[in-house]
């Protein structure tokens, strides 16, 4: 099942309480072109895959779309196939932990920032995907996937105009299965402390780590970029280009 919720008032949504989808878990897409502020008291109960979408329209199979003008009873029943971002609101994650379940997590917006220990975490093979004008991680914030024994790790895919690590960490961890890949692409990457890692602890290798930017990569020598297998998994590539 999938639940859509959109905000049309022109102000950013402040999420600092509990969103509970009831007895049956469902994927949740929150849409607000003006953006989101996710505070430390936020909790998501019975939520499968979570998407925070700070753009202006969602496209569905068959050509239908959901925007701020679409009538509530005209919501398409087909699968969403694209997110339209002619305008982008900002997404701030302040001391909150998004995800944690076995499903995926996606954030699509303008300036996306994690600070004061904010985190985007998935377990059980769920992927984390971020599409942003700019992404900043500071104050010990984390984007990560963690997978249990025998299960392949979830991937982290980031596409942003600028990516800045100010003491933040991007990491995939697999206890026994193949580690999840980390792919960071976009315009420029700057690190001032922090890390980008894929780690495995079993017989399978860690995932590949790739930072592929069109413009510049800087500060990597002051940070930690690694793909490490602390078992029998062998070597995995780290690519900067």
Model-inferred region functions:
Residues 1-125, 131, 136-141, 146:
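Solvent-exposed adhesion/ligand-recognition segments of exported proteins
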Residues 59, 113-114, 134-139, 151-152, ...:
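Short loop/beta submotifs within extracellular cysteine-rich repeat domains
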Residues 96-97, 120-121, 143-151, 170-177, ...:
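Tandem-repeat/low-complexity and Cys-motif detector
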Residues 10, 32-36, 41, 111, ...:
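Short amphipathic alpha-helical surface micro-motifs
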Residues 55, 96, 110, 117, ...:
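Solvent-exposed loop/turn tips at the surfaces of repeat/solenoid architectures
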Residues 102-105, 122-132, 150-161, 176-187, ...:
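Glycine-centered small-residue motifs that form tight turns
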